[in-house]
Swiss-Prot record:
GO terms for biological process: peptide catabolic process; proteolysis. Its EC number is 3.4.11.4. InterPro entries: ArgE/DapE_CS, Bact_exopeptidase_dim_dom, Peptidase_M20, Peptidase_M20_dimer, Peptidase_M20B. The active site is at D83, E176 (proton acceptor). This is Peptidase T. It is an enzyme of class 3 (hydrolase). SUPFAM superfamilies: Bacterial exopeptidase dimerisation domain, Zn-dependent exopeptidases.
Amino acid sequence: MTYPNLLDHFLTYVKVNTRSDEHSTTTPSTQSQVDFATNVLIPEMKRVGLQNVYYLPNGFAIGTLPANDPSLTRKIGFISHMDTADFNAEGVNPQVIENYDGGVIELGNSGFKLDPADFKSLEKYPGQTLITTDGTTLLGADDKSGIAEIMTAIEYLTAHPEIKHCEIRVGFGPDEEIGVGANKFDAEDFDVDFAYTVDGGPLGELQYETFSAAGAELHFQGRNVHPGTAKGQMVNALQLAIDFHNQLPENDRPELTEGYQGFYHLMDVTGSVEETRASYIIRDFEKDAFEARKASMQSIADKMNEELGSDRVTLNLTDQYYNMKEVIEKDMTPITIAKAVMEDLGITPIIEPIRGGTDGSKISFMGIPTPNIFAGGENMHGRFEYVSLQTMERAVDTIIGIVAYKG
């Protein structure tokens, strides 16, 4: 189905810079997200028909569309995030390419281009309307496509009371891209049986497995002396960091793994001979494998300290989120419904693990099972990001189908 306001909603949202800041100590991490929620989303939520609309100190804008059929007793939530990734988001100037011809798309005057030779996903979209960047910013389809789709679904249901639906709760939240947005989510206030994050990629994505995730911060303490007299005295902290890294499995890196394979990812190294710090992220799907990865890092640190004769390697491990499959597989109702709705719409569900996490990873462990459904974005987090308007329309169809489902 086509929705005349969907594109306008989306273009309005992406033009607002809501980039999050991992170094901030506030919630939300940037004032622009507060302004976007209170000045753009809250008025829009009221206009499209949501009731009891409010903004919480945790950064979430919340609203409700009451059920219009007493036989539909479920309460279902839909959640998308306001922030965008760590890439230029100031001055987003979207290009709307109607009836895409399958060829190269010039991204404004930037000199960058979307070429099917480089981005095979473009081969799916001839004849469709694509929204791209102008090459100077990201687009923000992650996750403003989700916000636009939820808003459009509510708008359509309000205008078409003949479509019977259950109670719907909507939540637009902050800071998903920096991994802290759902930390303060109020599950008791949201009060639904289950929810969906509308934060996936291409048409048909339906996901209920995520990584389990941890961060590892390492400190290597060296001893700096003049290199001319260093023998037997110098301890090079940079070399300690190299030695530690070389003891990790060389093939367990993001660029060499796929599917259900986990990894260690060296994110950052800074330092000198005297003192060096390294940051890793650890990812795996199975709980035992996840715990084994953390234990392996600790074992390497302990072994190095034993060989060095002092505690020169300090490891601090912090769990970040867990595989939501552990919660959702206890009651697959949200998956069963979404899968049935997609199939009824002629959409082939793509049920694959997320090699990452969503707000749903944390919200599921707060008592609200929250799988993820497609929002349409491709090449997210950079200048080559784009989205198909037709895929966004199908996401709206899916949301409407879920809340009207009577099975």
